[in-house]
Every structure is written in structure tokens, then in C-alpha cells.
């Protein structure tokens, strides 16, 4: 009965500032073509996300991050579009910005874009976010709200560096099958997930702890 009661409670949406990048017909077509090449899915839509990926921006500026994502610049290796983007960016002062709807696929994590929500924390290291109380609180609150809303389990909240061990990872382009990034290392995500769980318990929000990782063959 207690567990059922906890699951029934919903976390209120945190304050989110809508700051959209242009994601019109051209970028949608680019995204669908990208998804076809890399995942075998011809769609720009993010229908049923299973994963939330935490990133940091490697800069100290929301505006610079927004401009990068809005530019739709091709990647330097394959020179393909769409450019990088994330669904949410959290500034140093804790302001949460949303750039695209959660129903739109964003290019932020090789192998997982087809099923992942991307959250970028403005900063230059994991520690720069973990040591910033306002930003960390906003990041945890947003992530927990998304977990509750989209029914994403705690083990499927990952750092970018953990992408290769996600059971949802898939990549058709062979040269990218082992590609990942260094943001949000596993040890720091252990801390982050522990804080997420503590917040869920404090807010009496039921979340699933089921899930698993897979061995990386890279």
C-alpha cells in the first residue's frame, strides 16, 4: 500500500524557460535522414524515450551553447547534419531552458539519440556542477520530473561517458560504435544517481530502480 501511494504522487514541473532553437522542416528532414543512417529509423520524432543523458557544455555560457545548437553546423568528421542539440540546458544560476520539445530527436549522444533525452549543464567539469548547489538542485529536479513523467528508471539516467554500457545503445556506422565522451564519469554519476534517489524519497515520488548495464566490447 505504501509503495502504491508513493507511485501515485506526481512531482510538480520545475520552472522551465522556453528558448527554442529553429527546428523546422529542413532540420527535421536532416534528423530523419541521420536516424535512418545511424539507427535504421526514418523519423525525426522521439516517440518513447528510455534514457536521460547528462552532459556538461565545456563552457561557462548558456548563450554560447544556445548559439552552437541553433547553428545546425555539420559535424567535423562526416560533415553531416543535423548539428548537435540538447533538449534542456541548465545555466550556472539554476535556470532551466528548454530548446526543443521532448518529442523531438536531438543529436547529443552517439548510439542513443533515437531514445534519449539530452540535458546539458553549463560548466567545464562534473565537479563544476556537483559543487554548484543551485545548478545541481535544478538538474536533479528536472531529471526527476522527466523520469516521473516519461517513466524512465534510475539506472537509465546516465552520464555521456556511460553511453556504451547502455542496453539501448545502437549504431550502424562502424567507426562510431565505440565513440563516447568524457563528460559525467561513472563515479560522478554514482553520486548524481544517489542524490536523485534521495530527492525522490524526500519528495515521495515513486521511481523504478530496475535496469541493467551491458558490457562494452570497445
Where are these regions (language model features)?
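Bacterial N-terminal signal peptides that target proteins for export
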Residues: 1-2
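N-terminal catalytic cores of peptidoglycan-degrading enzymes
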Residues: 6-109
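Basic/polar, cationic surfaces and motifs that engage anionic cell-wall
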Residues: 11-28, 46, 125-218
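Structural preference for beta-strand elements that scaffold enzyme active sites
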Residues: 51, 116-118, 156
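Short strand-loop junctions, especially beta-strand C-caps/beta-turns
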Residues: 57, 122-124
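Short coil-to-beta-strand
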Residues: 110-121
Amino acid at each position: 500500500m505504501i509503495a502504491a501511494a508513493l507511485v501515485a504522487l506526481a512531482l510538480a514541473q520545475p520552472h522551465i524557460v522556453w528558448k527554442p532553437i529553429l527546428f523546422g522542416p529542413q532540420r527535421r528532414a536532416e534528423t530523419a535522414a541521420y536516424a535512418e543512417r545511424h539507427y535504421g529509423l526514418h523519423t525525426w520524432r522521439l516517440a518513447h524515450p528510455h534514457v536521460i543523458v547528462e552532459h556538461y557544455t565545456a563552457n561557462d555560457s548558456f548563450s554560447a551553447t544556445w548559439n552552437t545548437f541553433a547553428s545546425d553546423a555539420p559535424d567535423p568528421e562526416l560533415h553531416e547534419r543535423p548539428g548537435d542539440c540538447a533538449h534542456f540546458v541548465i545555466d550556472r544560476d539554476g535556470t532551466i531552458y528548454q530548446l526543443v520539445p521532448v518529442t523531438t530527436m536531438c543529436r547529443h549522444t552517439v548510439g542513443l539519440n533515437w531514445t534519449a533525452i539530452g540535458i546539458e549543464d553549463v560548466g567545464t567539469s562534473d565537479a563544476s556542477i556537483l559543487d554548484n548547489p543551485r545548478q545541481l538542485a535544478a538538474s536533479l529536479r528536472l531529471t526527476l520530473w522527466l523520469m516521473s513523467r516519461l517513466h524512465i528508471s534510475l539506472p537509465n539516467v546516465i552520464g555521456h561517458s556511460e553511453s556504451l554500457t547502455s542496453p539501448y545503445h545502437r549504431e550502424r556506422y562502424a567507426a562510431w560504435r565505440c565513440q563516447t565522451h568524457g563528460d559525467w564519469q561513472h563515479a560522478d554519476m554514482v553520486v548524481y544517481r544517489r542524490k536523485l534517489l534521495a530527492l525522490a524519497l524526500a519528495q515521495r515520488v515513486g521511481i523504478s530502480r530496475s535496469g541493467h548495464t551491458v558490457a562494452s566490447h570497445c
